[in-house]
A protein has these predicted regions:
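Active-site-proximal beta-strand elements of phosphoester/diester hydrolases
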Residues: 38-47, 82-86, 143-148
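Binuclear metal-dependent hydrolase catalytic cores centered on His/Asp/Glu-rich metal-binding motifs
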Residues: 37-79, 98-107
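Short, well-ordered beta-strand micro-motif
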Residues: 35, 43, 152-154
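Short acidic, glycine-rich surface-loop motifs adjacent to enzyme active sites
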Residues: 75-94
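Core catalytic region of metal-dependent phosphoesterases/phosphodiesterases
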Residues: 1-36, 110-111, 134, 139-150
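Contiguous, function-dense segments enriched for cysteine-driven chemistry
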Residues: 93-100, 108-109, 117
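Active-site environment of divalent metal-dependent phosphoester hydrolases
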Residues: 13-20, 49-54, 89-93, 115-137, ...
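Proline-aspartate-enriched helix->loop->beta-strand connector
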Residues: 5, 80, 105-122
Length: 155
């Protein structure tokens, strides 16, 4: 990586190559919970879609199964600090049919109350309204941040 900090990632809808050849010096947290310096970080990759040839396109039902499995892992410890996903939660910056969020992520918001939700997939220049253009959304106690391109966030 370019900065002296760890890099955690999840798969996006075009990341088939990362699955075959993971980037060096990075840690994939897709479908797992990582503890880093006292922070509990969970990751879920993929986006809305139903292309059976693309493992990173998921229906709402398939993602809901992944959320439930992740919540089983989270129940064994304290609350979630950071949620990292490729797609947003439904209603958080949605635009086209392909660029929709998952409703089941709201279950994670309710049950596990992440302080921060970092996501990508949505291109901010294609959205209307100040929240969407800035890419920062407040969903109850959770701050959801569109990290498309890049973001520097101090924790």
């Amino acid at each position: 990586t370019m900065i002296p900090a760890p890099l955690f990632y999840v798969y996006g809808n075009h990341d088939g190559n990362y699955a075959r050849n993971p980037p060096l010096g990075c840690q994939c947290i897709d479908g797992t919970v990582a503890d880093f310096m006292g922070l509990r970080i969970a990751g879920l990759g993929g986006c809305m879609g139903d292309d059976p040839t693309n493992p990173f396109q998921l229906t709402e039902e398939r993602m809901e199964k992944r959320v439930k499995k992740l919540q089983g892992d989270l129940r064994r410890g304290r609350k979630l600090d950071i949620l990292v996903t490729h797609a947003p939660a439904a209603g958080v910056g949605d635009s086209t049919a392909f660029h929709q969020g998952f409703q089941c992520f709201h279950q994670l918001y309710r049950d596990n109350v992440p302080t921060l939700h970092l996501f990508g997939h949505l291109h901010r220049q294609n959205h209307h309204g100040p929240e969407a253009r800035q890419g920062v959304f407040q969903v109850g106690p959770t701050k959801a941040v569109n990290c498309t391109g890049y973001r520097i966030i101090e924790i």
